[in-house]
Amino acid sequence: MAVHHKRAGSHRGRGSKAGRSRGRKFETSRLKDVSQDESSGKEENEHVEPEEEMDDSEASDVSSESDLDEPPKENSYSTLLKLLNSNAKSSEPARKKRKIKADEQDTTQVEVSMRTTEDVKQVDEVADTEASEDENMDNEGLHEEDDADGIGSDGNHDMFEIHFGNPDETELSKRIESCSRQWKSTKADLIDGLYSVASKPDVGDSLSTSLPTTPSPADLKLKQNLAKAAVSFDGLNSCLTPYIFGYYDTLFCSRTTHNSAKLRDLYCLHALNHVLKTRDRVIKNSAILSREDSGDIELRDQGFTRPKVLIILPTRQACVRVVDSLTKLYPMEQQENKKRFMDSFSAADSDDWGHKPDDFKELFGGNDDDMFRLGLKFTRKSLKFFSQFYSSDIIISSPLGLRTAIEKEGGKKLGNDFLSSIEMVIVDHADALIMQNWDHVEYIFSNLNLQPKEAHGCDFSRVRQWYLDGHGKFVRQTLVFSAFNTPELNALYNTQMQNVFGKAKIMPKYEGAMLNLRLPVSIKQTFSRFDSASPLKDPEARFQYFTRTVLASLARGWIESSSGKGKSGGTLIFIPSYLDFVRVRNHFANSSQTENISFGLISEYTSVRDSSRARSHFMNGRHSVLLYTERAHHFRRYNIRGVTNVVMYGLPDNPIFWGDLVEYLGSAASGAVTPTLRVLFSKWDALKLERVVGTARVRSMLLEKGGDTFTFV
């Protein structure tokens, strides 16, 4: 069920254009009739519109003169005049030959004849040199790092090379073919109570179930500018590094407020490394093709469109944190439109949140708008904010923001071609996205790696074969970080995370949220199991059990007291699903079972004013019952007073909410009234139940044949 939030306007504008450069000095120029085959030395990225290319090249030339090669000591213009004077009788324009060695001072040694084959060859070498200079200007720091990042020199140990750069086509085809069959899985214990379940397609070899080893930072083959950010890893990073940098699809279900910054830095480091290595390969291959006379060389190093990394986040402030991490790991001298970005994405925390929990402050602190999208483009030493999607390297967006970019009103598609060549998808704070509208996330994944409807300037001779075959989804890496696992995430893992090189689910072993309650005295916690044939029939079975068993018992207590504040007064009924909430609300309003009961309502759609009134009436006893949804608690974290009984229509997804709800009983526990807690669950609630009662207890509670009621004190 969608949740209504405030919406901000779309921010899809272009980044501001930088001033034009002053151009190359005449000392490094050539005459018109010299071959101008320098296409590889222009903008390094292959999928940018011509107009955008011009803008980017102008922007990248700002303050770039210091990066040019030093000119020869002797003025090339003087040399050119001497050449022209020596060939004054020639009917053809003379050609300048730039000196390659700066320490050659004797201009009399310059040959004046420009018609020989050797001269033409040398002039072509100068053209290649200048083209290379253009590439270096736009992509400084890429080529000199080749030896450090493993490209071309140690590709056998660089996972980028194995996975994307130069994969074994035969092995890749074999894995794609076996992807629809059985996968081999291996379970392994990790650190701090974590364990992993890693899977690979069964291709008939003994390596299919082998887990990756934990590398040291030096083994990651990072770009030199990024390597200093990975001097050492702590326990969590060492645990995740082999999966993330090994290009495994990874579902990590132990994200907390304490490790979120480390996780963010880790996946930003990986995303930057992937983008920079991809650009480096494209530029180097372009230089190779520009020097080859024959068209026999085939270099496939690109996708259909430029965007390579998609990061899905819940709020604008989360986007600010990711950008801060990117710029910290890869500092750039110029950041175009940074002020516009900060003005529209960042905000200060509310001063009224001193009592709010840390997870609430992390999610909703600052600008909590969930309607945004942002393109980031990396050129040389500049980072361009608000670049057009087809000109971007990284796209950061909320699910709603990206969906509205794909669709127009009325369901008419605007286009999803910019998602056709995404090679890495990162979904952070996935548990918060579930509370927004998970349907948007599923829609985005259904639009990934499809065949584009338009060319968008694509050079199909350089498109990787698996894209042409429609197999991009089998090579794409997907990283999902969540505080806990849910059926929605499991479905995403099983259907959309199809990386043929492997995938892993990393889960914690739970002690149980019910053991960490902050209460003055212990409270009896009763769990009631009901039978449910299937997930589709679970809502009906749950409602019937609630009305016939739980509500009937509560109603007897309400009837005994005409004031409604008898034995069952002060009852908070927590309902995770809004659909179930509507059904229970209608039952309270229309059933004879509850016709004399005064009740209040707080859902995610209830206004702040109505919520305050319902809480006040419940605290004062005017309402005997308060119906309260999980999303309402997620977005507002109310401190509800006057609670003496808690009935959980279903277990909360977030185990933190369990503690919040049970601790509402704290004031009653210290008084004369004996508080009660009753929870309904079925076998389809296994993931939720495990987080509450602990990994060691959940199996027996789901399979116990002796009874369906379990009590803990």
Swiss-Prot record:
rRNA processing among keywords: yes
Entries under InterPro entries matching the protein: P-loop_NTPase, UTP25, UTP25_C, UTP25_NTPase-like
Comp. bias regions, Acidic residues: 49-69, 125-149
Keywords: Nucleus, Ribonucleoprotein, Ribosome biogenesis, rRNA processing
Compositionally biased tracts (Low complexity): 78-91
Segments for region (Disordered): 1-158
Name used for this protein in its record: U3 small nucleolar RNA-associated protein 25
GO cellular component, one term: nucleolus
Compositionally skewed regions (Basic residues) per UniProt: 1-23
Biological role stated in the UniProt entry: DEAD-box RNA helicase-like protein required for pre-18S rRNA processing, specifically at sites A0, A1, and A2.
Native source organism of the sequence: Arthroderma gypseum (strain ATCC MYA-4604 / CBS 118893) (Microsporum gypseum)
